[in-house]
Every structure is written in C-alpha cells, then in structure tokens.
Amino acid sequence: MGVCMDARSELKGKRGLVRLLNATRYSLAGYKAAWQDEEAFRQICLLAVIGLPLACWLGRDWAESVLLAVPLVLCLLVELLNSAIENVVDRISLEWHPLAKKAKDMGSAAQFTAQLFLAVVWGGYLLGRLWA
C-alpha cells in the first residue's frame, strides 16, 4: 500500500506545465485504450466524424452548428465514462454482484439517454428544416 501512496504523492506534487503535459499524456492513453478495447466508442467516433462536419454544414449559423455538435460530443464523453465504470467494476471482480450490475446498467442508461438526446435534437432540427 505504501508504494501506491508514494506514487500518488509524487503525481500530486507536479505543477504547471509538467502537470499539464502529464495530464495530456494520460488523456491520450485513455483515448487509445477506449479505441482499442471499446467497439461502442469506435462506433460513436465514426458517428462524430460524419456528424460534426455535417453539423457545420447544416447549421445556418454558429449557434445551430453547436446545437447539433453538442449531442455528438456528449455521446463520446458518456461512452468514455461508461467504459471507465465498466473497467473499474471488472477490476474489482469479474464475479456477478447486484451492485456491479447496477453500476454497469446505470452507465448504459447514461449512454442511452445521451443517444436519445442526440436523436431528439437532430430529428427535431431536420424535421424543422424540412417543414420550414
């Protein structure tokens, strides 16, 4: 346990540019892990690669483009958090437990909610443009 605390203390002592560079490196490692291990993350990235330029093209101004982009980015964020929850639960134990199921189900529900939000925003926007 002392090793973990020493490592944590060493990381907490970093400040300024060193801390920022370390945080960036950890974030990039997180993206890499999600890309390699999570099919859902890759699917949402593909959706974002298509949807973000489409949002810029469809939006009549900056605000409309952002309105369409936010749900796409939200889905990416929620998938990263959902994957993190799943990994932590699996790290603790691979055995079935009602609390583990609850945590994973809640993460899944968060992603489902983000995807519903995406569908409502894009669907409403596109229908509004069709009937305008």
Residues covered by each model-derived region:
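Hydrophobic alpha-helical transmembrane segments
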Residues: 2-84, 92, 96-98, 108-132
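Short basic (Lys/Arg) and small-residue
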Residues: 103
